[in-house]
């Protein structure tokens, strides 16, 4: 098991690819910091991950488009897990409409979540990665 005992941070962990990555990492023995902007879904993670020990993971509310939120999550992961080995930047959103119908403000939010968040994640996670 290549990730056994490693600490991973997964953004967008409450659904889609993030949830699938979380389950795979837990299956392989990693300890996982699950982050998502959706507080309600995060509160269901204990039920959704009931086949895993709750000591294997911890959830964090996280707006990946916010630099301050990244700083807070990274600080908490370092306190709660002691280190970080793996970063999975899987949070993402879509336009929800065709480009002609999309307001520019919506496009900027998509850009912040899908691109800027990867920069922020790498910027703040890298210094504590072992």
Summary of predicted features, one role per range:
Residues 2-33:
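Canonical Rossmann dinucleotide-binding motif of NAD(H)/NADP(H)-dependent dehydrogenases/reductases
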Residues 39-40, 61-72, 104:
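The beta1-alpha1 cofactor-binding region of Rossmann-like NAD(H)/NADP(H)-dependent oxidoreductases
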Residues 52-56, 76-89, 95:
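A glycine-rich helix->loop->beta "capping" turn
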Residues 122-123:
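A short, exposed helix-loop element centered on a Lys and neighboring polar residues
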Residues 129-130:
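Helix-to-beta-strand junctions that scaffold the AdoMet/dcAdoMet cofactor pocket
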């Amino acid at each position: 098991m290549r990730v056994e005992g490693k600490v991973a941070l997964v953004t967008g962990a409450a659904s889609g690819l993030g949830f699938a990555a979380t389950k795979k990492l837990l299956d392989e023995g990693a300890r996982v910091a699950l982050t998502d902007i959706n507080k309600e879904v995060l509160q269901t993670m204990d039920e959704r991950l009931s086949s895993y020990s709750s000591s294997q993971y911890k959830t964090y509310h996280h707006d990946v488009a916010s630099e301050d939120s990244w700083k807070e999550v990274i600080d908490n992961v370092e306190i709660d897990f002691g280190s970080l080995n793996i970063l999975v930047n899987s949070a993402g959103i879509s336009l929800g409409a065709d480009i002609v119908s999309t307001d520019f403000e919506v496009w900027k939010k998509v850009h912040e979540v899908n691109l800027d968040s990867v920069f922020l994640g790498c910027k703040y996670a890298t210094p504590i990665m072992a």
